[in-house]
Each structure stands twice: as C-alpha cells, then as structure tokens.
C-alpha cells in the first residue's frame, strides 16, 4: 500500500471544521491536531458560512444533539453544498433512535455527505437492512457487513467506512478491508469519533478521491492503535488514549505501509 496523504496533511495543515460530540470534542481536536490538521470546533449556526469558507473539510457528528447544534449542522450542510466542500458524517446511534433518524434525513435532504463513517448498526440504517443496534455500539445482526456497506454506498451514492474488527471501505463497487486495530478501541469511548475526525483531515487534502482518503485515514488510525496496544505492558483503556495521540503524532507513512493488513474484495460484474 502506498501511503501518500499522511505527509500531505502534515505539509498543508488543512483546517477541518467540526460539529463534534460534546463527550469527545477534545479527543477529536487532539487527534486532528496530532496528525497535522488544524481543527476548529463550533456550535454557533451564525458562523457556519464563515467557517465553511475557511475550512477545507467539515465533519458532522450527531453524538450529543441539542437545538443550536442541530441548526448549525443544517447551516453547515447548506454552506458546504454551496461552496462544494467535502463533508464527513458520523451518524452516532442512528440505528437505535428515531429522533436521530429524523435529523439525519433532514441533513440528507440538504446534501449527500462525501463520506459516512459508522459501525454496522449505524450503516445498516442507511442500507435499509435489519440490524439490532445497541445504542452507540454496533449491536448484532445476521447480514454480511460488506453487503451492508455496499448497499449503503449504493443507496446514497457516497463513500462508506464501516468500522469494526475489520474496517470496510466501499464506494458501492470497490471494497477495501483493513484488519488492523485493537480491542481497546471498543473500550475507549471516542475512538470512532476520532477516526471520523481523521477522515475529515485526509479528505481535506484529497477531495477528488475520498475513497483513497478513507482508506489511508482508516489504515493510519488502525495501525496506530494496534502499535500502541502492542507496546503497552498492560493494555488498559485509561492509558491507551494519551499514547494513541502520541502515536498519531509520530507515525510515519512507512510504518503504516509496512504494518497495515489490507485486502481488496474482488468485484463481480
């Protein structure tokens, strides 16, 4: 695997505008900053147009909804559409809660996100496939996650990054699998939010190919987490996060390329 976008993020220091989950806002900002991007966080709809103007990408996370934040999400989606800026959407718990589904449907009316990052329970919602989502967690179901991801991508005509023990990236036809990672991602609330933030940084510097941006963001994050867990004498969630930030700061394209376990699913005509 050729890893070219990590150094591009560090060289260009792209501004990524974030409507973040209030639970993990500092984690997302620190992850983006560590990887080389410049995060800006906002909850004020009045500044949405100005923020989109200066940003190279926008990430929207519905993890902790409140009225002014929802208004800004709508304003950001409108401005991003008008200014043709890439948008990463993290639809936290959309598979479990009807109100969140309403908000997502309103956002989709305004524009189609460039990339959607979620777990199986969240992505299954977009695919219209039955899945027993468990709040913010993936839950369980009988469908093949690859089928779920492809169906969602084809329904929305966008890039899907379905995260889990194996990360799945698809545009509805091509499918890339990344098998790195650590179980500590599941014990640290905010891991998915951080990855969505990194997707924003990578797509900011490579908006013409969000599929490749998603692959490289997912590979970088999964490899960093795996290396942290491997290096820890006693892998514990409380010490995992700060070391993950350190690894994101120091990780090199060569380390990602040499460590990533990546495979392509054959395309059947």
Residue ranges and their predicted role:
Residues 2-7, 11, 79-84, 105-106, ...:
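N-terminal loops that bind phosphate or other acidic moieties
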Residues 2-89:
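Conserved N-terminal subdomain of the carbohydrate kinase-like
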Residues 223-269:
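Charged C-terminal helix
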Residues 100-175:
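Conserved phosphate/ATP/ADP-binding segment of small-molecule kinases
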Residues 69-118:
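Glycine/small-residue-rich loop that forms an oxyanion/phosphate-binding "nest" at active or ligand-binding sites
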Residues 179-189:
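Short pre-catalytic strand/loop immediately N-terminal to key active-site residues, enriched for Gly-Thr
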Residues 189, 200-242:
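Conserved post-catalytic alpha-helical subdomain immediately downstream of the catalytic base
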């Amino acid at each position: 695997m050729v890893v070219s976008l990590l150094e591009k993020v560090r060289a260009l220091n792209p501004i990524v505008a974030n409507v973040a989950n209030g639970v993990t806002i500092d984690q997302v900002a620190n992850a983006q900053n560590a990887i080389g991007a410049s995060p800006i966080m906002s909850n004020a709809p009045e500044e949405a147009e100005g923020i989109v103007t200066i940003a190279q990408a926008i990430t929207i996370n519905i993890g902790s909804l409140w009225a002014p934040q929802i208004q800004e999400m709508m304003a950001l989606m409108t401005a991003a559409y008008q200014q043709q800026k890439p948008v990463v959407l993290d639809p936290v718990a959309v598979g479990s809660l009807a109100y969140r589904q309403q908000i997502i449907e309103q956002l989709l009316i305004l524009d189609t996100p460039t990339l959607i990052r979620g777990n199986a329970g969240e992505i299954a919602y977009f695919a219209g496939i039955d899945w027993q989502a468990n709040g913010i967690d993936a839950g369980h179901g009988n469908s093949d996650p690859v089928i779920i991801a492809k169906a969602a991508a084809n329904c929305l005509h966008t890039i899907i990054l379905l995260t889990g023990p194996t990360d799945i990236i698809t545009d509805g036809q091509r499918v890339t699998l990344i098998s790195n990672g650590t179980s500590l991602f599941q014990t640290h609330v905010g891991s998915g939010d951080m990855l969505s933030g990194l997707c924003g940084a990578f797509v900011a510097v490579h908006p013409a190919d969000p599929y490749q941006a998603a692959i490289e963001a997912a590979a970088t994050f999964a490899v960093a987490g795996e290396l942290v867990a491997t290096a820890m004498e006693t892998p514990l969630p409380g010490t995992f996060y700060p070391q993950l930030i350190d690894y994101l700061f120091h990780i090199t394209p060569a380390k990602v390329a040499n460590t990533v376990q990546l495979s392509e699913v054959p395309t059947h005509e």
